[in-house]
């Protein structure tokens, strides 16, 4: 099992924690005391949406992210497993929704 450094950024504030490759980024954040938004925990609702600025994740169960947004770096932290050190912008639910479905009504 590999361990990686994860930096999460929200509103200009940065927090860093370690994440094991066999644990989701969200679970690792919670274990480190980093509070991130989440709801369904199954990769569907997009509450935990984030955008990867650098690094790679494996997210085979991210049903809430289409192929094109995934290519642009969007991920769902509840089902994203780190495969390298990561730098991530969090709280991207509205942005991801707009990208996939247009502006929320």
UniProtKB/Swiss-Prot annotation:
InterPro entries: 2Fe-2S_ferredoxin-like_sf, 2Fe-2S_ferredoxin-type, 2Fe2S_fd_BS, Beta-grasp_dom_sf, Fd_pln. Gene3D superfamilies: 3.10.20.30. Residues 4-94 form the 2Fe-2S ferredoxin-type domain. It holds the Pfam family Fer2. Its cofactor is [2Fe-2S] cluster. The keyword Nucleotide-binding does not apply. Binds 1 [2Fe-2S] cluster. Keywords: 2Fe-2S, Electron transport, Iron, Iron-sulfur, Metal-binding, Transport. [2Fe-2S] cluster binds at residues 40, 45, 48, 78. GO terms for molecular function: 2 iron, 2 sulfur cluster binding; electron transfer activity; metal ion binding. Ferredoxins are iron-sulfur proteins that transfer electrons in a wide variety of metabolic reactions. Belongs to the 2Fe2S plant-type ferredoxin family. This is Ferredoxin-2. It comes from Synechococcus sp. (strain ATCC 27144 / PCC 6301 / SAUG 1402/1).
């Amino acid at each position: 099992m590999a361990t990686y450094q994860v930096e999460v950024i929200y509103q200009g504030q940065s927090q860093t924690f370690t994440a094991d490759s066999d644990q989701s980024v969200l679970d690792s954040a919670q274990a480190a005391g980093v509070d991130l938004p989440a709801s369904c925990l199954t990769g569907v609702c997009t509450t935990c949406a984030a955008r990867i600025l650098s690094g790679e994740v494996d997210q085979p169960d991210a049903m809430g992210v289409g192929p094109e947004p995934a290519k642009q770096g969007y991920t769902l932290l509840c089902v994203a497993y780190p495969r390298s050190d990561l730098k991530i912008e969090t709280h991207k639910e509205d942005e991801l929704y707009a990208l996939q479905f247009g502006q929320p009504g």
